[in-house]
């Protein structure tokens, strides 16, 4: 198990439990595939897992995976791997923060059900675009080289 860490969510510090072994394997696999996918896209940077990202004075988040634009470090893809014993912070609180901050993409990777919820921002907020499982392929149109079957992700 990894070390606990803190996030500033809606002006309050929240102590988050250290992710478990499966969580960390999934995170490492996702980073490995994503790193290869962004290598040819200098406009995008992949941040280290759970790097502190201050959004404003009320929110400092630490997503499991984050892609930012190289020009201004603006977060454009956040990935949260949901922990069964600490899921509310990711699935409710942080999801609302991502929506309020108009983050263009959010993936909720849920090892409890071996699925991935893919959200896209529009003028009304975050919209659920797909719930992927099994042999369905997780892709991102802004990163044409990124393709990963959900089954492969959860075998990590």
Can you annotate each of these PLM segments?
Residues 1-156:
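Gly/Pro/Ser/Thr-rich low-complexity, intrinsically disordered segments predominantly at protein N-termini
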């Amino acid at each position: 198990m990894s070390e606990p860490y803190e996030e500033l969510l809606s002006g309050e510090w929240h102590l988050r439990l250290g992710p478990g072994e499966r969580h960390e394997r999934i995170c490492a696999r996702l980073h490995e595939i994503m790193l290869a996918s962004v290598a040819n896209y200098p406009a995008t940077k992949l941040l280290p897992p759970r790097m502190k990202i201050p959004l404003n004075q009320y929110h400092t988040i630490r997503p499991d995976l984050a892609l930012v634009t190289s020009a201004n470090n603006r977060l454009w893809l956040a990935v949260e791997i949901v922990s069964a014993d600490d899921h509310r912070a990711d699935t409710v609180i942080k999801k609302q923060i991502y929506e309020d901050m108009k983050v263009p993409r959010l993936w909720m990777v849920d090892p409890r059900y071996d699925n991935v919820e893919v959200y896209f921002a529009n003028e009304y907020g975050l919209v659920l675009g797909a719930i992927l499982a099994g042999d369905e392929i997780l892709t991102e149109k802004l990163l044409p080289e990124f393709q990963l079957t959900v089954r492969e992700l959860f075998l990590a």
